[in-house]
């Protein structure tokens, strides 16, 4: 993809720097606080994805998530397998109506629709990502089985009992309130059917009184557009409070033969995911610097690159210390 022309998403190029400054002000390193982020989550998350999506797609591809990974397996292969695993856990059948909550540009929904021969609706509140996702649907020839709806997942525009299955891949972490989000998912899911998710969470090893732990948490929050990273136990409580029966749950990061954060580790090198390596990120950072200098990229692009790099450092440190996971998995059922 053309990184330079897409930087800033739907934000006018002349307004990108102002958007970056406003986004940064939501976060603790720039004087922000959790209450403000939660109160303004729609604005914060939209600014984040307008600013960051082009970087994500350039470095990560169409599926913006981590994955359990086997030795000898490429990052791309592991990402597909991670998506297939979720679809199999849900038991999605051909022709069923499925909802992807917080679908990004639709990489997982296209993969799951093809894998299960189902009809998948992607829910997203970011206009740029939906525009990009529709273009990718057209290029992939899946317009009839994959579609997008622009809406807030805290206030879904669907009738009760609309979907045969619902899933979220590293997306509902953007919700200001887990219970409110899960309750909406419960409402639109048909009775007897299941909801599965990979959640970003702090683990039981996280110590809120440890300054280094809080620094890592803050780095992940600013670099990934998050109001607050919840504990795994809080997600589980919210699920049950929303009415779900939890079939099983587990932090899948614990069983990954290859660390999930390896693609971002500065000590790791891979030709198959070169753009994510330290060398690849260094090249991208300097390319953006040059593009901004010669005005092919909007002012503020370097600062986006900087807070994404800050996120990478926080994710690796959080993964190494086992205080953070991007794959707290659960499968939950709405009672009949």
UniProtKB/Swiss-Prot annotation:
<feature type="modified residue" description="N-acetylmethionine">
    <location>
        <position position="1"/>
    </location>
</feature>
<dbReference type="InterPro" id="IPR029063">
    <property type="entry name" value="SAM-dependent_MTases_sf"/>
</dbReference>
<comment type="similarity">
    <text>Belongs to the class I-like SAM-binding methyltransferase superfamily. Erg6/SMT family.</text>
</comment>
<keyword id="KW-0949">S-adenosyl-L-methionine</keyword>
<keyword id="KW-1207">Sterol metabolism</keyword>
<dbReference type="InterPro" id="IPR030384">
    <property type="entry name" value="MeTrfase_SMT"/>
</dbReference>
<keyword id="KW-0489">Methyltransferase</keyword>
<keyword id="KW-0808">Transferase</keyword>
<keyword id="KW-0753">Steroid metabolism</keyword>
<dbReference type="GO" id="GO:0000325">
    <property type="term" value="C:plant-type vacuole"/>
</dbReference>
<keyword id="KW-0752">Steroid biosynthesis</keyword>
<dbReference type="InterPro" id="IPR013216">
    <property type="entry name" value="Methyltransf_11"/>
</dbReference>
<protein>
    <recommendedName>
        <fullName>Cycloartenol-C-24-methyltransferase</fullName>
        <ecNumber>2.1.1.41</ecNumber>
    </recommendedName>
</protein>
<keyword id="KW-0756">Sterol biosynthesis</keyword>
<dbReference type="GO" id="GO:0009506">
    <property type="term" value="C:plasmodesma"/>
</dbReference>
<dbReference type="GO" id="GO:0016126">
    <property type="term" value="P:sterol biosynthetic process"/>
</dbReference>
<comment type="pathway">
    <text>Steroid biosynthesis; sterol biosynthesis.</text>
</comment>
<dbReference type="Pfam" id="PF08241">
    <property type="entry name" value="Methyltransf_11"/>
</dbReference>
<dbReference type="InterPro" id="IPR050447">
    <property type="entry name" value="Erg6_SMT_methyltransf"/>
</dbReference>
<dbReference type="GO" id="GO:0009793">
    <property type="term" value="P:embryo development ending in seed dormancy"/>
</dbReference>
<keyword id="KW-0443">Lipid metabolism</keyword>
<keyword id="KW-0444">Lipid biosynthesis</keyword>
<dbReference type="Pfam" id="PF08498">
    <property type="entry name" value="Sterol_MT_C"/>
</dbReference>
<dbReference type="GO" id="GO:0032259">
    <property type="term" value="P:methylation"/>
</dbReference>
<dbReference type="GO" id="GO:0005783">
    <property type="term" value="C:endoplasmic reticulum"/>
</dbReference>
<dbReference type="GO" id="GO:0009536">
    <property type="term" value="C:plastid"/>
</dbReference>
<dbReference type="GO" id="GO:0003838">
    <property type="term" value="F:sterol 24-C-methyltransferase activity"/>
</dbReference>
<keyword id="KW-0007">Acetylation</keyword>
<dbReference type="InterPro" id="IPR013705">
    <property type="entry name" value="Sterol_MeTrfase_C"/>
</dbReference>
């Amino acid at each position: 993809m053309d990184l330079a022309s897409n930087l800033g998403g739907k934000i006018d190029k002349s307004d990108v720097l102002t958007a970056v400054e406003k986004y940064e002000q939501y976060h603790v390193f720039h004087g922000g606080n959790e209450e403000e982020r939660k109160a303004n989550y729609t604005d914060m998350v939209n600014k984040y994805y307008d600013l960051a999506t082009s970087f994500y797609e350039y470095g990560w591809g169409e599926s913006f998530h981590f994955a359990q990974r086997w030795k000898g397996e490429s990052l791309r292969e592991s990402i597909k397998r991670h998506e297939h695993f979720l679809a199999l856990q849900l038991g999605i059948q051909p022709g069923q109506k499925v909802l992807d909550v917080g679908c990004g540009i639709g990489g997982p929904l296209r993969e799951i629709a093809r894998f299960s021969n189902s009809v998948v609706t992607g829910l997203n509140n970011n206009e740029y990502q939906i525009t990009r996702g529709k273009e990718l649907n057209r290029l992939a020839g899946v317009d009839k089985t994959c579609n997008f709806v622009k809406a807030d997942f805290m206030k879904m525009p669907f009738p009760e009992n609309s979907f045969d299955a619902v899933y979220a891949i590293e997306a509902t972490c953007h919700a200001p309130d887990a219970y409110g989000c899960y309750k909406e998912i419960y409402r639109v899911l048909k009775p007897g059917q299941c909801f599965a998710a990979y959640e970003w969470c702090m683990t039981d090893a996280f110590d809120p009184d440890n300054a280094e732990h809080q620094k890592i948490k803050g780095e992940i929050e600013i670099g990934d557009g998050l109001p607050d990273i919840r504990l795994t136990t809080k997600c589980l409580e919210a699920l049950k409070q929303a009415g779900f029966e939890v079939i099983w749950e587990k932090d899948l990061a614990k069983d990954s033969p290859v660390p999930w954060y390896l693609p971002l580790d500065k000590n790791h090198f891979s030709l198959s995911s070169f753009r994510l390596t330290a060398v690849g990120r260094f090249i991208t950072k300097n390319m953006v610097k040059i593009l901004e200098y010669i005005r092919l990229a909007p002012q503020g692009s370097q600062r986006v690159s900087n807070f994404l790099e800050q996120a990478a450092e926080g994710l690796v440190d959080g993964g190494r210390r086992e205080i953070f996971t991007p794959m707290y998995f659960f499968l939950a059922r709405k009672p009949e």
